[in-house]
UniProtKB/Swiss-Prot annotation:
EC class: isomerase
One term of GO molecular function: phosphoglucosamine mutase activity
Signal peptide: none
Protein name as catalogued: Phosphoglucosamine mutase
UniProt keyword list: Isomerase, Magnesium, Metal-binding, Phosphoprotein
Free-text cofactor note: Binds 1 Mg(2+) ion per subunit.
Catalytic activity line of the entry: alpha-D-glucosamine 1-phosphate = D-glucosamine 6-phosphate
UniProt cross-references to Pfam families, sorted A to Z: PGM_PMM_I, PGM_PMM_II, PGM_PMM_III, PGM_PMM_IV
CDD domains in alphabetical order: GlmM
Protein role: Catalyzes the conversion of glucosamine-6-phosphate to glucosamine-1-phosphate.
E.C. no: 5.4.2.10
Length: 463
């Protein structure tokens, strides 16, 4: 059995890989690991979920695991992942559990666990939980020591008050289209943006348990682009299923990705004296254009492996104030312990109003090099990445790109796929090189399918 935890919790096909039995064991193990220290008294865990159909089943399983280990379950219902992280600290809970597979299809689900204060767990703590899962349930309490279930009636309002602090000025006069991905932010995001003064047009905000992330949200911007143009909006914001991401499109429908958002926010924070150590933290996936834009204004860029958890670790280690990923995970520790798509949207709109600038004008501070990202589904990520044919294709690509571009090949931490990313001075070169390397990856093992780029464009590449 491989490691249970990936880069963003435990994920799998609900009821097949992520079974109620496994989730019950995870809940009990988390309770035993995270709720056995501190002063005597009742132990409490916050539990939330996104609206996908399997969430109700898995919520029941998590609650059974928690309460069977003597921990009270404080149920907050359908809310974004960053809401669960925030509420874990706000309620002074021992830990928090979010049931979500983020941007994944509805057939999947996942378990994310937050430690005290709403911080993501480190590898050692995850390993301890895994050991407890495989070691059995341990001694179970009885009688009054069994955990209880409590519904947190004020959870949504508490969270909305929290995110409202991200907008320091009124957004009156700004029109925004928000694509909620039929996900956890379908209610919270429009409410937060309206409370800040913006005119809000919400789309894909009618979750039925089945339609989450279905041709909408941050993984498919087609409907957002159309709505922005149709309503002549100032911008569009797209969240994923659990709203820890935010991507944007400008008034022309052009993408403003996480890299460009980070550049906009870094410049704003630098101007306000809030960019700690004049440093931005991002991952190896960020476009070279981000590095060039930051270098031109004297901002230091620190790079981590892919995954917001690694960005968070670097932010905490260096006491930095801004970090994120190209995919739209943006983290500002002063405003939350993890990435929050709604807060990102509010800060972006605040900058537009402060400077009386269009989003396109703000985003022009960064000139992105042509980048092609191809996701190749494979049966075995490790074997495919290490295959001689693939390594040869990568080496050939590196020679062709020279010092005017780069190639990055990495297994996904949350899905059965390998990501092929190529940047080059010319778009046709990037496409040609990426397609050739992706074909080599696809030829390994039992190839399933290939598409480009992280579903943002929705354009499939036939290899």
């Amino acid at each position: 059995m491989g490691r249970l935890f990936g880069t963003d919790g435990v994920r799998g096909v609900a009821n097949r890989e992520l079974t109620p039995e496994l989730v019950l064991a995870l809940g009990a193990a988390a309770a035993r690991c995270l709720a056995n220290s501190g002063e005597p008294g009742r132990r409490v865990a916050v539990i939330g979920r996104d609206p996908r159909a399997s969430g109700e089943m898995l919520e029941a399983a998590v609650i059974a695991g928690l309460t069977s280990a003597g921990v009270d379950a404080l149920r907050v219902g359908v809310l974004p992942t960053p809401a669960v992280a925030y509420l874990t600290g706000a309620y002074d809970a021992d830990f928090g559990v979010m049931i979500s597979a983020s941007h994944n299809p509805m057939v999947d689900n996942g378990i994310k666990i937050f430690g005290p204060g709403g911080h993501k767990l480190d590898d050692d703590t995850e390993d301890q939980i895994e050991d407890l899962v495989t070691g059995g349930p341990g001694l179970r309490p009885a009688g009054v020591a069994i955990g209880r279930v409590i519904d947190a009636e004020d959870a949504t309002e508490r969270y909305l008050r929290h995110v409202g602090k991200a907008s320091t000025i009124r957004l009156d006069g700004l029109t925004v289209v928000v694509d909620c991905a039929h996900g956890a932010a379908s209610s919270a995001a429009p409410r937060a943006y309206r409370a800040a003064g913006a005119r809000v047009i919400a789309i894909n905000a009618d979750p039925n348990g089945i339609n989450i992330n279905d041709r909408c949200g941050s993984t498919d911007l087609g409907s957002l682009r159309s709505a922005v143009l149709a309503h002549r909006a100032d911008l569009g914001l797209a969240h994923d299923g659990d709203a820890d991401r935010c991507l944007a499109v400008d008034a022309n429908g052009d993408l403003v990705d996480g890299d460009a958002i980070m550049v906009v926010l870094a410049l704003a924070m630098q101007e306000a004296g809030e960019l700690s150590s004049n440093t931005l933290v991002t991952t190896v996936m960020s476009n070279l254009g981000l590095h060039l834009a930051m270098r031109s204004v004297g901002v230091i860029v620190r790079t981590t492996d892919v995954g917001d958890r690694y960005v968070l670790e670097e932010l905490r280690a260096g006491d930095f104030s801004l970090g994120g990923e190209q995919s739209g995970h943006i983290v500002m520790p002063a405003l939350g312990s993890t990435g929050d798509g709604i807060i990102t949207g509010l800060r972006l709109m605040t900058r537009m109003v402060q400077t009386s600038s269009s989003l396109a004008a703000l985003a022009s501070a960064m000139r992105a090099l042509p980048q092609v990202l191809i996701n190749v589904e494979v049966a075995d990520k490790t074997t495919a990445a290490a295959a001689p044919l693939v390594q040869t294709a990568v080496e050939t690509a590196e020679v062709e790109l020279g010092n005017t571009g780069r190639i990055l090949l990495r297994p996904s931490g949350t899905e059965p796929m390998i990501r092929v990313m190529v940047e080059a001075a010319e778009e046709d070169v990037a496409h040609r090189v990426a397609t050739r390397v992706a074909a080599a990856v696809s030829a390994q093992g039992s190839p399933l399918r290939c598409w480009n780029p992280d579903a943002i464009s929705g354009v499939e590449l036939r290899l």
